Swiss-Prot record:
The keyword Hydrolase does not apply. One of its GO terms (biological process) is translation. Keywords: Ribonucleoprotein, Ribosomal protein, RNA-binding, rRNA-binding, tRNA-binding. This is one of the proteins that bind and probably mediate the attachment of the 5S RNA into the large ribosomal subunit, where it forms part of the central protuberance. In the 70S ribosome it contacts protein S13 of the 30S subunit (bridge B1b), connecting the 2 subunits; this bridge is implicated in subunit movement. Contacts the P site tRNA; the 5S rRNA and some of its associated proteins might help stabilize positioning of ribosome-bound tRNAs. It comes from the Bacteria. It holds the Pfam family Ribosomal_L5_C. One of its GO terms (molecular function) is structural constituent of ribosome. This is Large ribosomal subunit protein uL5. Part of the 50S ribosomal subunit; part of the 5S rRNA/L5/L18/L25 subcomplex. Contacts the 5S rRNA and the P site tRNA. Forms a bridge to the 30S subunit in the 70S ribosome. NCBIfam families: PRK00010.1 (NF000585). GO terms for cellular component: ribonucleoprotein complex; ribosome. Belongs to the universal ribosomal protein uL5 family. The gene is rplE.
């Protein structure tokens, strides 16, 4: 069974974008290819449990086991050696991606304190969107009593859109709450 947003994309979003931008083929319509969740954990150089807890949190949020990212180069100023674990990331595609996007837009974003919408300026010029989340507790899968620290994460939404205008229209069609 396809995810709810996947059906919504095929039935509602594609015709709307074809009408708005005048695409000749259905394959021209921009689509979301992947969503990457990244958690940078610079403080993990002192305590290995931080990495384990962050991996557990990301697993609950994404429904998929993340990869522990390691330092590419040694940086003496940050007391980091090459190969030290300094973060965790997970890439979502297909059905899991649509299910995460659905939960993120309908459940997690409204739980952010003082939420007035996401910035419409976080596009990179090539149709990809980045959003930073300050606390992982906005996701309902994370139990507030069982976390050791509040950690933020970066969410990158990669699309096939050629420019920011097309990408904003695509995410707007998915009911993304842009503030401007």
């Amino acid at each position: 069974m396809a995810a709810r947003l996947q059906e919504f994309y095929k039935e509602k979003v594609v015709p709307k974008l074809i009408e708005q931008f005048g695409y000749k083929s259905v394959m021209e319509v921009p689509r979301i290819t992947k969503i990457t969740l990244n958690m940078g954990l610079g403080e993990a150089i002192n305590d290995k449990k931080i990495i384990e807890n962050a991996v557990g949190d990301l697993t609950k949020i994404a429904g998929q086991k993340p990869v522990v990212t390691k330092a590419k180069k040694a940086i003496a100023g940050f007391k980091i050696r090459q190969g030290y674990p300094i973060g965790a990331m997970v890439t979502l595609r297909g059905e899991r991606m649509f299910e995460f996007l659905d939960r993120f837009v309908t459940v997690a974003l409204p739980r952010v304190r003082d939420f007035r919408g996401v910035s419409g300026r976080s596009f990179d010029g090539r149709g990809n969107y980045n959003i930073g989340v300050k606390e992982q507790i906005i996701f309902p899968e994370i139990e507030y009593d069982k976390i050791d620290a509040l950690r933020g994460l970066n969410i990158s939404i990669t699309t096939t859109a050629k420019n920011d205008e097309e990408a904003k229209a695509l995410l707007g069609a998915f009911k993304f709450p842009f503030r401007n």
